Design a protein with these regions (language model features):
Chain B
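Transmembrane alpha-helix signature in integral membrane proteins
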Residues: 46-57, 129-160
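C-terminal transmembrane helix and the adjacent membrane-cytosol boundary/short C-terminal tail
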Residues: 62, 228-229, 240, 264-267, ...
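Transmembrane-helix boundary motif in ABC transporter permease subunits
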Residues: 64-72, 146-176, 189, 340-345
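Generic hydrophobic transmembrane alpha-helix motif, especially the helices
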Residues: 177-212
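Interhelical loop and adjacent transmembrane-helix boundary motif
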Residues: 280-329
Length: 289, 349
């Protein structure tokens, strides 16, 4: 594609993504006030072996908002999101520096019960991963069993979680069939329902729609919008339309061959319509990346 | 009528009648050549026919393909012929063993085999007297005790190697692989010197099971390890991300997801030991009576019964031995087929 063509297309795309983000912002600001800082990342660095993959990320995630992390592959988005609920340490050779504060307390301070942290900060993965040995209802309630939590009424919780994940109507008649029998999009919403059952304050989503078709993607985006009222959501996405549609704030990460760094952070409307950094503008207009 | 209904399905990639005629000609030429060459040379016997047929087939097939389709196709034909010959060499002995066992064993089959033991009969009695019951129950008890001992140990070893991946993972992996090559007589002698002489001082089914466990644990551990490695890492991460501890995630997510594969591992372990003879000869003492107590007294088993009957050497006892071999083979076959069915059900899910 020639340079002229991209330049011509560029501003059009910027303004249309900006419009999408603004429409969302206007519809939302009336209904949900921002509730204070839920999760704060302070100077996060991450390494795999000797290689630094993430440098000095500091970000505040406000309660009741959706924050999107965008950037090209390999810029450290997924690594960053995994440091937020201590899943980073699962990879052999991983190391990190910095603090992650949940309600003001560092989740990495010694003596912290890491399983409690992961209960408060849930995660939805890139590939739908329902537990194959469990039925739909067992999948939703798996977190309770895994973390040995007690609830008074499991049926109510089951319905509530599936309802919030936008799956209840599709599966209410076959709760005892296996999770693997659902379609990919339904499986992913089942995984969202499963994360909701332990009542997390923060939900991390690592490219939750990258393996799904547009219809399922739309359903999940609706789910995200519903959930955002009551929790902090952080979503990694490669799809800039999606970032514009669902998020309140957007962070743009970039790696120039070395560790990934945050280039720009701001309200989603600003990032897509008036980016301050030329690299952000190039990325959101599709001129590179 | 739509056009789709008028179009006939065809398979243009299949061999044309002419090509099929040519390859039939190659077979016939090779057969004729093998007869002629064996007749005019001093070579003798079935093996000579097979060998000459194989060489002649390769030569004719190569020539035909070289002239009709060129050198690369001809090379391909040689490779195909060698692979086919390899399969025949590998499969023929197995089929031959099965056929021999069936032909020689079915004379000795009668319903009494499963209802009588040999307490009141000797192996030289007529074939329709006495039975295998003591050997069947003995083998069942030996295998069951070995199963109880080695399945938990084997699966836990596999979990250590795949889930915990501790500091000793490498040496343990090496040991398990080395152990699966241990000759069974060594396991028997080990139990004999470590348990029977110093402690029990006598035959029993239990010490036999101990020796069988030594042979079974590596099989169960290796197969379970392979099965657990197939479980996608996503599931482990999902379990931990839901607030489960490492152990609870393994117990509630990973192991249930691998359930049918672990059952397969168990069955393969049983098939490995069901026919083991050497440690049984050393440790269980045989016996002609049904013995339900694994801790006291000699205990019969199928391999022991086969060995004993065959070593007597009378026509009746040899028929008994072949019948017992047939029963043992059938049991192992059933185990393998059920293992295969279970693992197929897993992969189709």
């Amino acid at each position: 594609m020639s340079d002229e063509m991209t330049t011509e297309r560029g501003p059009g795309l910027v303004s249309s993504l900006g419009d999408v983000a603004r429409r969302r912002f206007e519809s939302k600001s009336v209904t949900t006030p921002v509730q204070g800082v839920g999760l704060e990342a302070r100077g996060i660095h991450a390494w795999f072996g000797d290689r630094m993959v993430l440098e000095d990320m500091s970000l505040d995630f406000w309660s009741g908002t959706v924050t999107a992390l965008i950037g090209p592959s390999g810029c450290g988005k997924s690594t960053f999101i995994r440091t937020l609920n201590r899943m980073h340490e699962f990879i052999p050779g991983a190391a990190m520096a910095g603090q992650v504060l949940l309600n003001g307390e560092d989740i990495y301070s010694s003596g912290t019960d890491v399983t409690k942290i992961r209960l408060k900060i849930g995660m939805v993965f890139q590939k739908p991963n329902p537990f194959p040995s469990m039925t739909i209802s067992e999948n939703v309630l798996a977190g309770l069993k895994l973390a040995q939590l007690k609830v008074d009424n499991k049926d109510d919780l089951l319905e509530e979680c599936l309802e919030r994940a936008g799956l209840w109507n599709e599966v209410k008649d076959r709760l005892s069939s296996y999770g693997g029998s659902l379609s990919g999009g339904q499986q992913q919403r089942l995984c969202i329902a499963r994360s909701l059952a332990v009542r997390p304050e923060v939900l991390l989503m690592d490219e939750p729609c990258s393996a799904l078709d547009p219809g399922s993607t739309l359903r999940i985006e609706e789910t995200i919008s519903h959930l955002a009222a009551s929790m902090t959501i952080i979503i990694v996405t490669h799809n800039m339309q999606q970032a514009a549609r669902v998020s309140d704030y957007t962070a743009f990460l970039l790696s120039d061959g070395g560790p990934g760094k945050m280039v720009e952070f701001g309200p989603t409307g600003e990032i897509f319509s008036r980016p301050k950094d030329i690299r952000t503008e190039n990325y959101v207009t599709g001129r590179f990346g | 009528m739509t056009t789709a209904a008028m179009v006939k399905p065809s398979k243009p990639w299949q061999a044309s009648p002419r090509q099929r005629f040519n390859s039939a000609l190659v077979y016939i030429a090779a057969i004729v050549a093998s007869y002629v060459i064996v007749a005019i040379t001093p070579m003798k016997g079935k093996l000579a026919y097979a060998f000459v047929f194989f060489v002649a087939f390769i030569v004719f097939d190569f020539t035909l393909n070289l002239f009709s389709r060129g050198f690369p196709v001809a090379k391909d034909a040689i490779a195909r012929a060698i692979v086919a010959a390899g399969i025949c060499v590998a499969v023929f002995p197995i089929l031959s063993i099965i056929a021999t066992v069936i032909i020689r064993g079915y004379h000795g089959l009668h319903i009494g085999l499963f209802t009588h033991d040999m307490a009141l009969n000797s192996v030289t009695d007529p074939v329709n007297q006495g039975g295998l019951l003591h050997a069947l129950t003995g083998t069942a008890i030996l295998v069951l005790v070995a199963l109880i001992l080695s399945v938990p140990l084997g699966i836990l070893t596999a979990i250590y190697m795949t889930e915990i991946r501790g500091r000793f993972m490498k040496p343990i992996k090496f040991l398990v692989q080395a152990m699966s090559g241990v000759p069974s007589i060594v396991a028997g002698l080990f139990i004999l010197s470590a348990v029977v002489y110093p402690i029990t001082k006598g035959y029993s089914g239990f010490v036999g099971s101990l020796a069988l466990s030594i042979l079974m644990i590596p099989t169960v551990a290796r197969t379970s390890e392979e099965v657990l490695l197939l479980i996608p890492n996503d599931l482990r991460e999902a379990g931990v991300a839901l607030g489960g501890t490492h152990w609870r995630t393994v117990a509630m997510v990973v192991v249930p997801a691998a359930r049918s594969g672990l059952v397969t591992a168990m069955i393969l372990g049983v098939a490995r030991i069901a026919g083991e003879t050497a440690p049984i000869l050393l440790l269980t003492g045989g016996g002609d009576k049904v013995n339900g107590d694994p801790f006291h007294g000699p205990m019969g088993s199928l391999p022991f019964y086969i060995w004993k009957s065959y070593s007597v050497g009378t026509p009746e006892s040899i028929t008994r031995a072949w019948a017992a071999i047939l029963v043992l083979l059938a049991i192992v076959l059933v185990l393998f087929v059920s293992a295969r069915l279970l693992s197929e059900r897993r992969s189709s899910k």
